[in-house]
Design a protein with these regions (language model features):
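Basic/polar N-terminal segments that are highly enriched at the extreme N-terminus
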Residues: 1-5
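Phosphate-handling substructures
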Residues: 78-141
Length: 143
């Protein structure tokens, strides 16, 4: 029996942006933007160092400054442009963006508990409020 050639595989590396001012303060960010802190820039540099020996064909980033800045630091030694897309933004938290994360958690604790009881399919489509994206909506933007 003749062996078929292996299909070409694509390896996808997902990298989170470095720490931002809002991360540091515990503020819900979502699709609002906040600049990287000095620690966030250092995190991006460390990530770049860890990835330095890996060949990339392309680098994608959301259009938010924090993600673009992180991607730009990672690509410094590479001859690649960073391709940005609004579709790669984080989940939108609607009216909760800019508010304290601890208040968000406290306000929705009963819903966090409810999600744990749902099937995987139900959990993916569950919405905390009409203006907060479900997992399904976030994934739908990426694909």
């Amino acid at each position: 029996m003749m062996k078929q050639k292996d299909e070409k595989l694509c390896t996808l590396y997902l990298v989170r942006h470095g720490e931002t001012e809002w991360n540091k303060k515990g503020i819900v960010m979502g699709q609002s933007d906040s600049p990287l802190t000095e620690a966030g820039v250092e995190q991006a540099k460390t990530t770049a160092q860890e990835l330095k020996d890996i060949h990339f064909d392309v680098i994608f980033s959301s259009d938010l400054h924090r993600a673009q800045r992180t991607a730009e630091i990672i690509k410094l030694e590479r001859q690649l442009a960073v391709q940005t897309s609004k579709a790669l933004r984080e989940r939108t938290y609607g009216s909760w963006e800019g508010k304290m994360g601890k208040d968000y958690r406290k306000n929705f604790q009963h819903l966090f508990d409810k999600v744990k009881t749902l099937s995987e399919k139900e959990a993916k489509s569950f919405k905390f409020t009409d203006d907060i994206e479900s997992d399904e909506e976030v994934i739908g933007r990426f694909i």
